[in-house]
Every structure is written in C-alpha cells, then in structure tokens.
C-alpha cells in the first residue's frame, strides 16, 4: 500500500519540510544519545568517577550508564569525597536504578548484589543474586558467585549444590572451590567430597588438592576411586604421581603407578618395569618407566632389535670427545630398605670404539650417590654380553635409579663411536 500527499501550496511544502527536519533532528539526537551512552558505559574505556557521575546526571534513564557508575564504585570501594558507607549507598542506588530500567538484564542483578553486599545488606545481596540465577540459570559465573556469597554468609550447606553445579559445568573451577571449602570448614573432607560430582576425573583433581595439604593417604584413596581408563587418559594422573614423588612418598607413588599401568591386557609384576622395552612409554606416565634423553654425545631410542623380544634400547654415539652419560637413560625403582638385590641386563656393541665403555649403575634417587656399578661394556666382540650389579638399598632411601653411566677419567678423552644395544633388564632379591 502506498500513501502519498499532494502539497500544492508553498506554505504546506515549507511546513512539511520543517516537520521533516524536526523528525530527522530527533532521530539524530536519539542516535547521538545512544552512541554517547554506549561509549560512556564501555568498561574498556578509562573514564574517571566524576565524569561518570556527570554522565549519569545527564542521562538519568540510561541503564548502561547507571550500571557502569555503580560498577566503578563497587570496584574502587574508595572515594576521597565521601565515606565508604556513603559510597556503598550511592553505588547501591545506581545499581538499583539500572535494574529498574532493565529488569531482564541478569548482569545488573549481579551488580546490585555486589553493591548490596558492599553496604552490608546480605539479604538483598542474596535476593538479587538468586534473581540473576533465575534469569540466567545456566550461567556458570552467576552460579559461582551465588556459591561464594552463600559461603561468605555462613550458608555452607546451601553453597554445596552451587559449587557442585559449577564444578561439573566448568571443571577448571573445582580446585578453587575445594580451596574455599577447605578454609571455610577447617578441612572437613566429607564436605569437600560432596562437590566432586559424577565426573571420575574430578577425583584426580581432588587427589591433587589433597597432596597439597600433605594428606597422602586420603589422596591415594581419591586417586584409586578414579577408574584406570580415565587415569590413563587424564594429564592430571601424572601430576598427582609427581606430587607424591616430590614429597618423597615413594611407596604410594609406586603402588598407584603400577595399579594404573597394569591394565587387564598388560600386566608386569617385575620389580623393574618394562625391562625389555616392550611397552611403549605413555606421555606423562613414565614415573617408574624408562626416561630417555639425548645429549651432545649420544642419541637414545627404543626400536626393533631386541635380544629376547621385539624391541631394545639403542644408544648411538655422535663421535664427540670426552663423552659423558649420567642421566640420559634412567629408571626409578622403589625397593625394600636394607634389602640386597641383583640387577642384570644384556648389552651388544656394534663397531664400538671407546677408551672405556659405559656401565650399568644404581644410584640413590635423592642424592645421585652411586651405590654400585657393573663392569664397562666390552669392545672385544659384537655379541650380547651380560652386565650385573649387586647392591644394598639404603635404609633411609628406598628409592634408587638404574642408569647407564659413562664418566670420562680425564679432562679429555678420545671420541666414543659406534652403537650399543641394551635389553632384558631384570632385578631380583638376593
């Protein structure tokens, strides 16, 4: 449908033109006001408090400007021109006006809650935040603030449901939730366990938290409640085991690591795990498996070519003088304190040229003191040869390292060249 007018007189045309100008000016003014209020309300734009107050006075019906002013006051909590109480009251008034102007905006309800808490009105703070949660029930940030407010006001029981919701929706917040509840309840583990939810990996987060409190038995129990499949997949598993090791909890670390690695189709009850290099190391889970690192003197890799199995450790020298190997190949063991053990392995050199070949050594895990070592790998024949080490585990240090060790006797030695294969490491009690 088309509507048209015929303006025959000059007066009517002038009147119409004037009305159009007024309408355009009004629309332009509205757009200008919208632009200015959006700029003033932008949190990324640095505007001092005085200017915000002037803007709020000039645009009294702008919810955005009112909210920005209230937010600024809540954040600063300090104004040289007025007391804390007066500032809190003013912030509350502006936040309340923002809610009145835009009642469907949950963020303004959150702001009103903060302003109410700032002036000591806990009931209004809780009421406003509950309304925000009603408007945005799936907003994790709102639920997190609800949980914190309830905890601050002593409503621990009510806060647990909120903390649990947040932990399930955003697992990254679980460590903070555990810390807050730990402090609020004086370390009541029964309370902390109620926020873990159904995610098995939450048990690993909980276990890591407990290691930080030096509650290693409780941490081990929490760790064990997470099924093996999830443990093998989660990077948290390695962090928990590392925390046990860092605290010298060798026995717990060994027990939990073996329980994790001994899946239904892969069991290894030997004192020295993976002695024949048949199991592929898992990233982050090599605490009691082989640690291999190249250096400037040699490269180490597990590949096909084993003595009794499919694979072996290949050590290839780079032909650099004064060759030194200390921790490039090592394996952590937890053993019985004071007990005597015999370590054996096989080595096969290929075109090995050296002043003195490497040895198999057993060192303390804490001080790296050498407890015993084998004879050097012989260059006499390119065949598998047996290396053996007898040693006693220190009573005060049940954790030891098996290493491939080559220390030059002099400040300069001729380059070591060639390759050595290592395989079939075994450990037995004497």
Regions found by a protein language model. Name each.
Residues 29-44, 70-82, 118-121, 154, ...:
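Short coil/turn linking the two alpha-helices of tandem helical-hairpin repeats
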Residues 13-34, 38, 172, 194-430:
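Extracellular and organelle-lumenal recognition/adhesion modules and their flexible linkers in secreted
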Residues 65, 108, 142, 173-177, ...:
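TPR alpha-solenoid repeat register
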Residues 73, 116, 150, 180-181, ...:
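Residue at a conserved register position within TPR or TPR-like alpha-solenoid repeats
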Residues 54-55, 97-98, 131-132, 166, ...:
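Canonical positions in the second alpha-helix
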Residues 57-61, 103, 137, 168-172, ...:
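Short coil turns that delineate tetratricopeptide repeat
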């Amino acid at each position: 449908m088309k509507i048209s007018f015929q303006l025959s007189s000059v007066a009517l045309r002038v009147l119409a033109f004037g009305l159009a100008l007024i309408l355009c000016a009004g629309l332009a003014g509205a757009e200008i006001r919208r632009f200015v209020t959006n700029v003033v309300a932008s949190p990324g734009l640095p505007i001092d408090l005085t200017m915000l107050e002037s803007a709020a006075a000039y645009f009294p019906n702008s919810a955005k400007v009112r909210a920005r002013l209230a937010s600024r006051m809540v954040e600063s909590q300090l104004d040289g021109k007025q007391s804390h109480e007066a500032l809190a009251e003013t912030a509350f008034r502006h936040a309340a006006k923002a809610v009145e102007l835009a009642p469907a905006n949950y963020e303004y309800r959150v702001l009103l809650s903060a302003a109410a808490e700032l002036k000591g009105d806990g009931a209004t703070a809780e009421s406003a935040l509950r309304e925000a949660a009603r408007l945005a029930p799936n907003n994790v940030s709102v639920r997190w603030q609800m949980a914190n407010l309830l905890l601050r006001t002593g409503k621990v029981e009510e806060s647990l449901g909120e903390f649990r919701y947040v932990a399930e929706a955003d697992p990254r917040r679980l460590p903070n939730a555990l810390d807050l509840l730990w402090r609020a309840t004086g370390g009541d583990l029964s309370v902390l366990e109620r926020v873990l939810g159904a995610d098995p990996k939450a048990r690993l987060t909980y276990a890591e938290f407990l290691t930080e409190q030096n509650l290693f038995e409780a941490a081990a129990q929490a760790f064990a409640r997470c099924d093996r499949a999830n443990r093998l997949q989660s990077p948290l598993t390695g962090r928990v085991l590392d925390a046990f090791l860092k605290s010298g909890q060798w026995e717990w670390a060994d027990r939990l690591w073996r329980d994790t690695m001994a899946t239904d189709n892969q069991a290894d009850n030997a004192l020295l795990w993976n002695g024949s290099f048949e199991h592929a190391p898992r990233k982050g889970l090599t605490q009691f498996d082989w640690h291999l690192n190249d250096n400037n003197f040699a490269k180490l890799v597990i590949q096909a070519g084993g003595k009794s199995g499919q694979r072996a450790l290949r050590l290839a020298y780079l032909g650099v003088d004064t060759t030194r190997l200390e921790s490039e190949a090592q394996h952590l063991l937890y053993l019985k304190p004071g007990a005597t053990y015999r370590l054996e392995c096989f080595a096969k050199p290929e075109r090995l040229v050296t002043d003195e070949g490497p040895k198999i050594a057993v060192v303390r895990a804490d001080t790296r003191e050498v407890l015993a070592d084998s004879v050097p790998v012989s260059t006499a024949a390119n065949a598998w040869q047996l290396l053996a080490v007898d040693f006693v585990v220190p009573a005060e240090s049940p954790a030891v390292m098996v290493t491939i060790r080559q220390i030059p006797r002099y400040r300069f030695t001729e380059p070591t060249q060639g390759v050595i294969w290592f395989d079939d490491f075994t450990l037995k009690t004497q």
